Curated annotation (Swiss-Prot):
Induction: Expressed at 30 minutes post-infection during the period that most rickettsiae escape from phagosomal vacuoles into the host cytosol. PANTHER family: HLYC_CORC FAMILY TRANSPORTER, UPF0053 PROTEIN YRKA. One of its GO terms (molecular function) is flavin adenine dinucleotide binding. Keywords: CBS domain, Cytolysis, Hemolysis, Repeat, Toxin, Virulence. Belongs to the UPF0053 family. Hemolysin C subfamily. This is Hemolysin C.
Amino acid sequence: MLKSSKHEDSSSKKNQNNKLIFIVRQLFYLIKHFFSKTKTPDNFFGIIKRLKINSQKMSLDEFNILANLLKLEDKIVEDIMVPRSDIIAIKLTTNLEELSESIKIAVPHTRTLIYDGTLDNVVGFIHIKDLFKALATKQNSPLKRLIRKHIIAAPSMKLLDLLAKMRRERTHIAIVVDEYGGTDGLVTIEDLIEEIVGRIDDEHDQQLDSANFKVINNSTIIANARIEVELLEEIIGEKLKNDDDEFDTIGGLVLTRVSSVPAIGTRIDISENIEIEVTDATPRSLKQVKIRLKNGLNSDNLT
C-alpha cells in the first residue's frame, strides 16, 4: 500500500511538472514571437491554440500569467511608469562616499538614476554592486565610470516593444520623456515582469505597505496620497468616488475639492464624516494625508 501511494504521488508530481514545463515553454515561444522581426500569425495562433487546449489543466497562477501576457499587447508605457514626482535620483557631482551614504539612507533599490543638473538630464544609472565594489577596492573612480546606460521611451510606446528594446539594449531601466524631452517617469524591467507574473513583494514592499496606510485609532488614518480611493472606501465603508470621476487616488480626491495643491496643514471636508488634512506635500504634488472620521471606523470593515 505504501509503495502504491508513493508511486501515485510521484506520478502526480511528474504530471504536474510536465504540465508546467509545457505552459512555460509555450509562453517563452509566445514572448519570442513578439520579439521576432518576422512575426508569423500562424505560429502565434498555433501557440495560443495549444495553450487553450491545455487551459483546463492549468492552475490559477499559470492561467493568470497567460492572461496577463495577452493583455500586455494592449498596454502602453504610461500605464505602468513611475511618475516623475516619485523618482529617486542622485546628482552626477556626488562623490562615491556621499553616494554610498545617500543610497543607504534614501534609496531602497539596487539601481539608482544619476542626473546632471536637473532630472530632465538623466545620464544613466548605477548598480549598487558596482558602487560597493569600487568602495571595497578603494578605487578613486569618478562616478561617471560606474554609470550604466538607460534607454528612452515615449509614454505611448507599447510595453511589449519596450520589453523587446530592453532585451536588445541589455538594460534594465527606461526613462520616459514627454514631447519636450523632459523626464516624465521611468519603467524598470521589474515593472514589466510584474505585469506578467503579478506583483512581486520583497521586504521593502512590505515596509512600504505598512507605512503607506496606517490606522492610528478608531477615527484617524495616515495614508500616502497615492493610495487608491477604493482601498479607503473599503476600509471606511463609504462611497467617495462616482463612476464618472477621473481620479483614482486619495490625492486626486483632494485635488477635486481645491483649485491647487494645498499647503501642509490644510484641512478639507470631503463629506459629513470625513476630513482630510495635508501632512506632507511639495508645490507640485501631495505626499501624505491624515484622514479623520467623525463617526469613527466600523469594526466590521477591518476584518
